[in-house]
A protein has these predicted regions:
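Surface beta-strand/loop "capping" patches
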Residues: 285-288
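An alpha-helical repeat/solenoid feature that recognizes helix-turn-helix modules
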Residues: 1-54, 58-109, 116-283
Length: 288
């Protein structure tokens, strides 16, 4: 097909496509639901995702930009960018897990090449334009998404190195805005590492404080539950201004990507996404 997109920017397009993929549990349901109105009038949601995946494949970089994705989605990627890589691979992984749509192996191989050979630091963390540029836990979560898409086992040296980096920097209270690798006050980083650890199917990370339930730590920060966190961790940032606890209207503040993009509604959605158990597959709900 000619491809389709919901937004022209990689972040927003990925979030919107993930919402569709998680709204319908399987291929049959997605094929049965027909869009009424707008540019995709008469299409099924399944057709829309297939076309969106075609575009994702098309704008992946080639040659010396092999496997890259950049901010805009209507032209081939012009450089490597560790912050954008995770959104296309997240959609590809969700399409496979939810609806059984398997993308060509070359797309996945190229994505791994970008993360492993162009963006990874020796310590396993993922950087911005290279493995020595703005390496942090958030972008490393994006690396874990890509490695999980490629079905790397946990004992693969590449996967193990990335997990080790995440654990070693788990309790850094210095986020990217302040030049550090941590996730505190950074909803983008929190959602990114949540995606990566969830898809890697690990329940704990090995940190300076021992084994930690990463989901509990992230959720505790967002809910303002100080009793669940080490006393010294981010002690100067324990206020709603740093995403520690919700605002009165149930939303969160942010200090990075979502401070100026999307408004409070997207911050609320991302906050809930961070705390939700699962990303492409969700635990069964008990019947009470």
């Amino acid at each position: 097909g000619k491809g389709a997109h919901l937004f022209t920017r990689t972040y927003a397009n990925g979030l919107a496509l993930l919402a569709i993929l998680t709204a319908y549990p399987d291929e049959a349901t997605a094929k049965a639901k027909i869009i009424s109105g707008g540019p995709f009038n008469g299409w099924s949601y399944y057709e829309l995702i297939v076309e969106a995946l075609d575009l994702i494949k098309w704008y992946q970089g080639d040659g010396d930009k092999r496997g890259s994705w950049f901010y805009g989605i209507t032209q081939t990627a012009s450089r490597y960018d560790g912050s954008t890589q995770q959104w296309p691979t997240m959609v590809i992984k969700a399409a496979e897990d939810r609806w059984g749509i398997v993308s060509p192996q070359w797309v996945i191989d190229n994505a791994v090449h970008a993360m492993q050979n162009r963006l990874s630091s020796p310590g396993g963390g993922i950087g911005y334009s290279s493995g020595s540029s703005s390496v942090d836990v958030g972008k490393t979560g994006g690396g874990l998404v890509t490695y999980s898409l490629a079905k790397m086992p946990l004992n693969d040296p590449v996967m193990a190195n990335a997990l080790s980096y995440a654990g070693a920097n788990w309790f850094s209270a210095t986020p990217r805005k302040e030049g550090g690798p941590g996730w505190v006050s950074n909803l983008y980083a929190m959602f990114a590492i949540k995606k990566g650890l969830d898809l890697a199917d690990v329940e704990t990370v090995t940190t300076s404080e021992g084994e930690r339930d990463w989901q509990r730590d992230l959720s505790s920060w967002l809910l303002g539950r100080a009793e669940n966190l080490p006393a010294s961790f981010g002690s100067s940032k324990r206020s709603p201004a740093y995403s520690f606890g919700q605002n009165a209207d149930g939303t969160w503040e942010d200090t990075w990507v979502f401070i100026a993009r999307g408004g409070k509604n997207i911050r609320a959605a991302v906050g809930v996404g961070i705390m939700a158990r699962g990303l492409t597959d969700f635990p069964p709900k008990p019947i009470i």
